[in-house]
Amino acid sequence: MKKSTVLFALVAAGMARSALAAEPTPFNVQQLVNLNKLHSAAVSNDGKSLVYGVKVVDDQGEASSDLYLLDLTNKNAQPKQITAAAGTEHDVSFSADNKSIYFLASRTGSSQLYQLALNGGEAMAVTDLPLDINGYKLSQDGKQVVMTMRVFPECKDLACSKDKFTAIDESKTSGREYKQLMVRHWDTWEDHARNHLFVAQLNGKKITEPTNVTANRDTETPPKPFSGMEEVTFTPDGKHVVYSAKAPSRDQAWTTNYDLWQVPVTGGETLNLTEANTAWDSQPTFSADGRYLAYLAMTKPGYEADRYRIMLRDNVTGQEKEVAPLWDRSPSSLTFSADGRTLYVTAQDLGQVSIFEVNTQFGDVRPIYNQGSNSLIAVTNNQLIFKKSSLVEPGDLFSVTSEGEQLTQLTDVNKDKLANIKFGEYEQFNFKGWNDETVHGYWIKPANYVEGKQYPIAYLVHGGPQGSFGNSFSGRWNAQLWAGAGYGVVMVDFHGSTGYGQAFTDSIGKDWGGKPLEDLKKGMASVTAQQPWLDANNACALGGSYGGYMMNWFQGNWNDGFQCLVNHAGLFDMRSMYYVTEELWFPEYEFGGTYDKNKELFEKFNPVNYVENWKTPMLVIHGEKDYRVPYGQGLAAYTYMQRNGIPSELLVFPDENHWILNQDNLQQWYKNVLGWMDRWTAK
């Protein structure tokens, strides 16, 4: 974002507050957790109406969530609240006739599907099922619904699964029994239940016995832990469901071979549509007329950060091709135009998440909108509706024409709260990193920046490692919170980061401690030379996951660069890490195989092998429910420092996983982190 654009946004926010309002204060964690959160947006099929959810947090920290309706045909329209029940309505969809909406809510103790007429009245339960519905999708004609519920594959009906869950809860024994991996995933021990798909007719009758179209298959769809209903769809004729899943096998922990499967809506034989590809296939998406199936496909088995290719299958001729094979970006979503000739996609791009138009016949790619981080909601009537956030915008809905013109803000869910918040000015920069290649990053000035002063640095290192600290607004690692606390913030997208071409992403493979370390050193030297208000001699570095690994790597390989370090969920010993993490495909690809077959590379970049160089004060943070990087990694680093007299503190959250999600815990996290940094930077 250009500097002038940022300043304009800040001025506009300031003008919005009333004359009696308090002066804006530097952003703090209390303000972060109290921001309203927009979610669950949907656009009607005729493009005239928008429904979205807003979670509102009051000054006492109490939260409520409701749905709002906005008339898109009237530029002066104000949103109308259409729900007021306790709890949260989410996963909104419009009916085929646009007269009602569907959503999920837990109004009777379990998550069920509801329908609400938009001309008034109360929401009516569409389902009465003994298990939670975790997601759903409507057929194109609106006459069917596919739902995902967690069941036991051997059970013939939902009551059987309900009884099994109850028996587990009431069992007097606590032992968990396993015969193959995975035994736990992300933050949950496996209980042998699976996400399955159920289809039912929407005919005005309450759904009580949907058809399990994935019956007897010991597989997960949508895949855990983060996939949703973007991995499931009806064929446009309503005769089949297509979904992404792994085949049942004993190699679940070390394969990324997700395929697209097609099954009749009545159940029966399942057809593997992508059997030839042994890498990841994802997000089946049909053109409205059913002729084309588009989906995303990787080509490298076992590599979760491979570039997603856009594949297009002609269901009439049976021919398939890659669309835009020379486009060096990895799409994260697919949406067909009404005529099926264009795909609208989002992809990380130079620190942004941008929206692109892709011609399906010729493969031409054209950027439509490339400021901030954007997720596409719908394409209708030559308008793209999307959610946008940035380093100074928590998230609202916008529209833009398919030509990328007439950007219009549709919601302003934090108008009053943002009027009282002062953000730091930010700018993207670049420098010559490893191999003299261009590397990008961001700096942010302290919110109360004064010309001529120098400020301590918060050097944020992202995780992944195939990830990015870009132009987005995070609910966890929010760079503006350090700016609000008086720090100059620096973030570098080192070699291995995403959004800069696949070769750049791939370059970190088998070189975890090499190119990234060189980039981070050169990035610090470059930005402090360019921006003299940054105090190069008074900096603390922070990182989570791979970023936490890098804090441990700094200790052994760059131990004179920082006054302090903060290591959140960082890897300490690559040998033990390999044997206790859950998704084995990740370390096996990153380090060229299993530990026993490739010890040399695992040990080359193993922080524990360099502990004799450790001396920088470090705060270690870990969640006990972190099964990606189990908490023993953090405990081991802390133990070494304590035993060897290195200033160190440990913060453990028994109820958190790899991320800090509880809002009270998040406030404790920031209190400890900023307190630790203030201590060592003498701020």
Q: How should these model regions be labeled?
A:
Residues G47-L50, N98-I101, V145, V241, ...:
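Hydrophobic beta-strand positions that form the internal "hydrophobic ladder"
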Residues V450-Y455, L460-Y500:
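Short substrate-entry loop that stabilizes the transition state in hydrolases
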Residues S40-A42, V146-T148, E170, S174-V213, ...:
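Non-catalytic accessory segments flanking enzyme active sites
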Residues N45-D46, A96-D97, Q140-D141, P236-D237, ...:
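Residue-level detector of Asp-centered blade-edge/turn motifs that repeat once per structural unit
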Residues V54-D66, T83-H90, L104-Y114, E122, ...:
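A flexible loop/linker signature enriched in serine peptidases of the S9 family
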